[in-house]
Amino acid sequence: MDWTEKYRPTTLSEVRGNDKARDALKKWAETWDDHREAVILYGSPGIGKTSAAHALANDMEWPTIELNASDSRTKDVINRVAGEAAKSGTLTAGGGGRRLVIMDEADNIHGNADRGGARAITALVKEASQPMILIANEYYEMSNGLRNNCQDIEFRDVSPRSIVPVLRDLCRQEGVEYESDALQELAEQNSGGLRGAVKDLQAIAETTERLTADDVVTGERDTTEGIFEYLDVVLKEAGAQDALEASYDVDETPDDLINWIEDNMPKDYEGTELVRAYEFLSNADQWLGRVRETQNYSFWRYAGDNMTAGVAAARDGTKGGWTRYGPPSYWSKLGRSKGTRNTRDYVAQQIAAIDGVSMRTARREIMPFLATMTHHCRNRELTVAMAATYDMEAEHVSFVTGSGKDTNKVQDIVADAEALKEEAAVEHSGGVFEGASANGGDGDSDADGDAPDTDAGEESGDQQVTLAADDGAESDATSDGTTTDDETETASEAAEDDDQQSGLSDFM
């Protein structure tokens, strides 16, 4: 079990490293009847904002309603879920009839995925008759209207002096032997982030019987310079063992490091060595998936072996020259303009709706996977299938693949995706669009191949599927119910072909 969850504070008195913010939050709660204002908790990730909010709820005996980034946060959802909770109390014995509404990542409400959400939150904090806590990393990413109608409390980065006692307590709780210097090194490396220090401690503790300073990467490191030097070592110079040892000096988790390597590897590798390297990256990705599923961080070791030693071993000798390495294109796009965030959120919403996963899973797991599989549209057939499945326009395909949206390549892919959707709507809808029934009929309906019309605006691609399926069902109801052998064989072949080329949800 993840130690950050296992040992999450249950009362405010257990929250470490932000005494001033903790006291201010307690005062806000105790005087809420006097001011009736929402409060914004803001600061860097991993420093205890969400934990403090839940600990406060326990102290005040307030039931909680939480809406986070993994949920759809449109105007309707906010009004239905958070709105009802914020305007009505509870009949439970404790807490004075109050309930606490917690909205995580309140600074990350953008675009189609959360349409109207920001305005709905602003209206809600003005009208709420129950206490509300908004949690944000970037205070000024929220609108002026929202900030002006809330109190605010800043959570500062946690100092190493406050982190060390927490790590010491965890070691005692888990029966881990340790050297004091090792805990100090961990705290300094994660200065500012208590959650990161705890995760690092768990990862190391699960791979050794006694935690020593040698187990901890020493020295303060510059992440950007370190990663570029490391890429030079792995992709050009080092053998397998040296590449593995070099990874210990890079301030990146395996989840992040694999993206750096994958995005820059094709700049130095080609042909069979690139194929071999991708096989090692695939193995590493499987081990990382097991970490996410089991929370067993000892599997990080095997992921690291594959993505570092394996990738280095796949190379045919050393390489010279200078290479312009860069951050993973998928990451770099995430921090750009609001328009890019809108594009990202549309893609995430489509994935979430069609694959039946949360927005968080769509953003953090499936989108990076798609970006890798369709990088620069090299696998054209798969890219067309992706665009058809998730109803993508040129800007969406460009965002995921890293190719320019105005290029002929992307435009042709979008056109082929439209043709694939039209064909699926006429012949069958079980392949490209999972869950829809076959669109039958008497052969005369939709003979021109046009897809059924959908409402403009907020209707997404999955609504298009529903309409196509409904039309087919209605047509079936009016037909004579007979089907020829040729028609059955054709439909079967089409479904089989479609399963092979566009069943993204299946193989994911």
UniProtKB/Swiss-Prot annotation:
It holds the Pfam family AAA. ATP binds at residues 43-50. It comes from the Archaea. Keywords: ATP-binding, DNA replication, Nucleotide-binding. InterPro entries: AAA+_ATPase, ATPase_AAA_core, P-loop_NTPase, Rep_factor-C_lsu, RFC_lid. One of its GO terms (molecular function) is ATP hydrolysis activity. Residues 425-508 are annotated as: Disordered. Signal peptide: none annotated. CDD domains: AAA, HLD_clamp_RFC. Disulfide bonds: none annotated. NCBIfam families: PRK04195.1-4, PRK04195.1-5, PRK04195.2-1. Belongs to the activator 1 small subunits family. RfcL subfamily. Part of the RFC clamp loader complex which loads the PCNA sliding clamp onto DNA. This is Replication factor C large subunit. It comes from Haloarcula marismortui (strain ATCC 43049 / DSM 3752 / JCM 8966 / VKM B-1809) (Halobacterium marismortui). The gene is rfcL.
